[in-house]
């Protein structure tokens, strides 16, 4: 830290506690204004005089001044106060104009738009008021924050308004329709009820980024269009940042923190270049518009000017200032006339209820005269401007007729104001996106597509783009030559056979184009293109022998690999995204507008292109307030999704078709790290960890694929075995899907041997996990839970192992319970076999059974001898079913062959179970008859054709 002295002068008296003080320069650096929340007066200082001249004092408020705002041309000064009033003055004379609006609670922040025609005001009241500075009418109220608003900033072009509240939530408003462009929840520190500390957002002078105080004593930059985090400035601040301000050219930014430091940053280099330590916290700063100086004011009301803060060896903060012309009010705000008039009348009623002050506030009659005069003057000025351009505008009288038409037609419709206010909180539907694509960056290579197979990248060069296609495994795919892109493709999809590209519509002459490029073809000129008139391609996908494109007309167009137009389907809503895998195509569309809670309402449909069928349809599950960021198929073919809150879900046919959350970044995410999903399988998530809070990976250097274990968002259990519970649920899910595939394949007569082997291995692995959980339950005395786990065991030998385990742990009562569960399982198995596999006599006729039901023996401790007898009688049975297991259709197909190989009839087995001796002690359970076990194993070996009769745990 450089050693320098900065003398501060007292501008306002502050009591014992800290206050929030403000300081502003005018656009010519001739005057600066100061105020304090502990002082009802405003001081206008002479910025040109070298001597200390007394400031001009403005005394119109009844309580402390909490906020100041100057219009860009420095002709209007606005002030907000704890006395609930917003006042307007001429500047620099300080002549009072009017109480432009009132609140029911203290005001915290004010902001002018670029042209000075709108003033935004907010505070402890609900809602942000947009006030017409010409006539004082309230043109809109923006509602969406859940806490007092402490910061406001208009975008340089006047189309957007950024706001932040005490909870650290940022909302970006589109002023044309009053909807929220994006929401950044809890990204800034929570200031609570401390009114001397505020959160503030600040647009960069070029309008590309939004700077917000971060949670880690840093400044975080967000993208203007998407709200995605771009980068962060982190330096020597020891406590949270409480104020920030951009240099006029946007090359530098100054920040003040609760640690009483002011840091100067080089934004391009992302590092601090100078800092200054003060005696008190600096609560407001303002760059001098025409010099290398920064004015500061601390929490005690003392101000000073930090001269020559940017080193002379670096670019001056006044060089290269962006020249952005703000749009006129009528080009930005497209309000309904009726709503505008009703809100105006509502503001009049509020002012009538509050009463006029004694400081010279204008009456409403004078406001109307002011509005009439202003409209005429404004229209005359606009007419002269348009005449110079050779065009024309409506006359002033026509403009007045238009602005009052809604009021005349709907004289008594007072509900219109409330409808207008409610409409301002309408959230925006998510735009369409291509899975695996990154936003374009000028001069940088970006991804058009990135998946588990490979990637497609593009970079603009001399007016055209150069596209390159690479496979992660070079031996898996062919070498694809680079391509010159003359269309400006922004989306792509790749699989083993080819890749498809598309670009948006760029005017009437540049139509949206779809292009397919096969990797291998027996014929020349296999590439083909399609052009779309009057519609725009939003998303593309490809699969086995087909290419698909979804357009702005909600049309799903399916083409063959050769370019034949095969199918055209109308979708139910605007497309969000689409992805293909082999024969399947998944399409996500909007169902309706966003809910008032900012929840997206989406629907997915999975088509089988080769069969021309729709296999799945349902709603897309999302975390409340989040957006869909990725969709794809797992390696096993399960539809999967990932949202902006970091929750990965897999769609399963369980419970009639449901989404299961299999991963959440809330427990896995590291500091300053985001996960960009690429793919997944039954146990792992493949993603790219983006450092420094970047939302997308960079092409250079080549991103590294990160493998994360799937982890369900489980509740904290008293068992302390969350990893085992997570493993069990994942194995159950995988076993369920595998057995479902076995059933589906068996119904159509397809060989299922390989899948049955896989299912058996999963059963063994699942039982091992359950046995470990039983051990944990016994250690924590959770015996009821252990009994439930015993019932989930699939294989008979696993159940016997559980009995052995609890016996060794000296838990005889639990061993007795486990033994009874085993006996019930064996009886149920024999009873089911008697029903599904009836006995046949030598003539092939079904033998009628006298005993149709088997009475269960009393639940008591079983001997090893009786248990071995049961093993002997059930050696040829399939493994016992679990909650997830289904009866195998394939076994029914083999019924005739299996019936001829039975060594005993089912009647004999039932009688054998009934004759079990139940009087021996539990310790005999551990004694095994080796001869009987050998006989059982030999019996199992004879049935090796059934994969579910393999050797178990």
Swiss-Prot record:
Disruption phenotype: Enhances phenotypes of the lhp1-3 mutant, thus leading to reduced plant size, early flowering in all photoperiod conditions and altered leaf morphology, associated with an increased expression of H3K27me3-positive genes. It is found in: Nucleus. Residues 853-877, 944-953 have a biased composition (Polar residues). The keyword Repeat applies. Coiled coil: none annotated. A motif (Nuclear localization signal) lies at residues 900-907. Residues 926-943 have a biased composition (Basic and acidic residues). Induction: Induced by the auxin analog 2,4-D. GO terms for cellular component: nucleus. Pfam families: Ctf4_C, Mcl1_mid, WD40_WDHD1_1st. It comes from the Eukaryota. One of its GO terms (biological process) is response to auxin. Its main location: nucleus. Participates in maintaining the H3K27me3 mark at target genes by interacting with LHP1-PRC2 complexes during replication, thus contributing to H3K27me3 inheritance. PANTHER family: WD REPEAT AND HMG-BOX DNA BINDING PROTEIN, WD REPEAT AND HMG-BOX DNA-BINDING PROTEIN 1. This is Protein ENHANCER OF LHP1 1. The gene is EOL1.
């Amino acid at each position: 830290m450089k050693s320098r002295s900065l003398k501060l002068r007292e501008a306002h008296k502050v009591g014992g506690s800290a206050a929030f003080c403000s300081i502003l320069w005018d656009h010519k650096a001739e005057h600066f204004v100061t105020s304090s929340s502990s002082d009802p007066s405003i001081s206008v200082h002479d910025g040109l005089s070298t001597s200390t001249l007394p400031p001009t004092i403005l005394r119109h408020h009844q309580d402390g001044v909490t906020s100041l705002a100057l219009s860009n041309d420095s002709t209007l000064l606005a002030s907000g106060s704890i006395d609930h009033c917003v006042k307007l003055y001429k500047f620099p004379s300080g002549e009072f104009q009017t109480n432009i609006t009132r609140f029911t609670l203290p005001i915290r922040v004010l902001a002018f738009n670029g042209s000075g025609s709108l003033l935004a005001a907010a505070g402890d009241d609900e809602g942000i008021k947009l006030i017409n500075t010409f006539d004082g009418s309230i043109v809109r109220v923006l509602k969406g924050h859940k806490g007092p608003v402490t910061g406001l900033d208009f975008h340089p072009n006047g189309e957007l308004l950024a706001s932040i509240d005490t909870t650290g939530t940022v909302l970006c408003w589109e002023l044309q329709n009053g909807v929220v462009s994006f929401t950044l929840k809890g990204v800034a520190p929570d200031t609570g009820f401390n009114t001397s500390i505020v959160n503030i957002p600040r647009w960069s002078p070029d309008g590309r980024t939004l700077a917000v105080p971060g949670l880690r004593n840093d400044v975080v930059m967000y993208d203007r269009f998407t709200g995605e985090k771009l980068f962060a400035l982190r330096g020597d601040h020891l406590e949270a940042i409480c104020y920030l301000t951009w240099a006029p050219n946007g090359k530098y930014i100054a920040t003040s923190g609760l640690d009483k430091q002011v840091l100067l940053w080089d934004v391009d280099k992302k590092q601090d270049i100078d800092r200054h330590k003060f005696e008190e916290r600096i609560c407001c700063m303002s760059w001098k518009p025409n010099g290398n100086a920064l004015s500061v004011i601390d929490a005690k009301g003392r101000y000073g000017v930090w001269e020559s803060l940017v080193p002379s060896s670096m670019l001056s903060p006044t060089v290269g200032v962006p020249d952005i012309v703000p749009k006129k009010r009528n080009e930005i705000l497209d309000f309904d006339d009726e709503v505008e008039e009703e809100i105006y009348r509502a503001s009049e009623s509020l002012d009538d209820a509050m009463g006029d002050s004694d400081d010279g506030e204008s009456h409403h009659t004078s406001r109307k005269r002011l509005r009439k005069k202003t409209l005429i003057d404004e229209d005359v000025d606009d007419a002269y401007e348009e005449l110079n351009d050779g065009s024309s505008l409506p006359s002033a009288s026509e403009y007045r007729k238009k602005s009052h038409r809604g009021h005349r037609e709907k004289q008594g419709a007072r509900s219109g104001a409330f409808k207008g206010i409610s409409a301002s909180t309408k959230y925006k539907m998510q735009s369409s996106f291509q899975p695996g694509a990154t936003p374009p960056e000028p001069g940088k290579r970006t991804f058009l597509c990135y998946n588990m197979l490979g990637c497609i990248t593009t970079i603009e060069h001399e007016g055209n783009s150069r596209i390159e296609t690479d496979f992660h495994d070079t031996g898996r795919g062919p070498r694809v030559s680079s391509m010159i892109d003359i269309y400006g493709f922004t989306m792509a999809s790749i699989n083993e056979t080819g890749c498809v590209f598309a670009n948006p519509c760029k005017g009437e002459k540049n139509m949206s184009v779809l292009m397919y490029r096969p990797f291998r073809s027996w014929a020349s000129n296999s590439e083909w293109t399609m052009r779309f008139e009057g519609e725009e391609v939003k998303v593309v996908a490809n699969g086995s022998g087909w290419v698909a494109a979804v357009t702005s007309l909600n049309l799903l167009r399916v083409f063959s690999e050769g370019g034949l137009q095969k199918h055209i389907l109308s979708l139910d809503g605007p497309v969000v995204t689409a992805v293909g895998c082999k024969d399947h195509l998944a399409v996500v569309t909007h169902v309706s507008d966003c809910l008032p809670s900012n929840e997206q309402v989406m629907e997915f449909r999975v088509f089988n292109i080769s069969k021309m069928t729709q296999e799945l349809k349902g709603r897309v599950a999302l975390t409340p307030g989040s957006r869909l960021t990725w969709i794809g198929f797992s390696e096993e073919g399960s539809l999967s999704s990932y949202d902006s809150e970091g929750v990965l879900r897999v769609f399963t046919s369980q419970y009639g078709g449901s989404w299961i959350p299999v991963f959440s970044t809330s427990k896995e995410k590291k500091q300053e790290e985001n996960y960009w999903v690429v793919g997944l399988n039954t146990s792992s998530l493949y993603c790219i960890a983006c450092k420094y809070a970047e939302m997308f990976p960079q092409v250079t250097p080549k991103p590294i694929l990160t493998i994360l274990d799937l982890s369900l968002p489980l509740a904290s259990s008293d068992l302390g075995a969350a990893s085992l519970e997570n493993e069990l649920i994942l194995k159950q899910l995988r076993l369920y899907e595998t057995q479902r595939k076995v059933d589906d394949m068996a119904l159509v007569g397809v060989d299922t041997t390989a899948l049955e082997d896989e299912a058996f291995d999963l059963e063994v692995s699942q039982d091992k996990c359950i046995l470990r959980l039983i051990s944990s339950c016994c250690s924590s005395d959770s015996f009821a839970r252990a009994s439930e786990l015993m019932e989930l065991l699939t294989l008979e030998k696993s159940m016997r192992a559980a009995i052995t385990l609890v016996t060794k742990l000296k838990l005889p009562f639990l061993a007795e319970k486990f033994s009874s569960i085993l006996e019930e399982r064996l009886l149920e198995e024999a009873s089911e076999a008697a029903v599904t596999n009836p006995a046949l006599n030598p003539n092939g006729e079904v033998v009628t059974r006298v005993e149709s039901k088997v009475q269960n023996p009393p639940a008591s401790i079983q001997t090893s001898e009786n248990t071995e007898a049961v093993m002997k009688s059930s050696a040829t049975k399939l493994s016992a079913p679990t909650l997830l297991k289904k009866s195998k259709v394939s076994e029914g197909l083999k019924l005739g062959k299996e019936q001829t190989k039975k060594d005993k009839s089912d009647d004999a087995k039932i009688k054998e179970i009934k004759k079990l001796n139940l009087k021996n002690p539990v310790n005999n359970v551990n004694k095994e008859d080796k001869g009987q076990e050998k006989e059982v194993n030999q019996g199992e070996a004879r049935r090796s054709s059934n994969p579910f009769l393999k050797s178990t745990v």
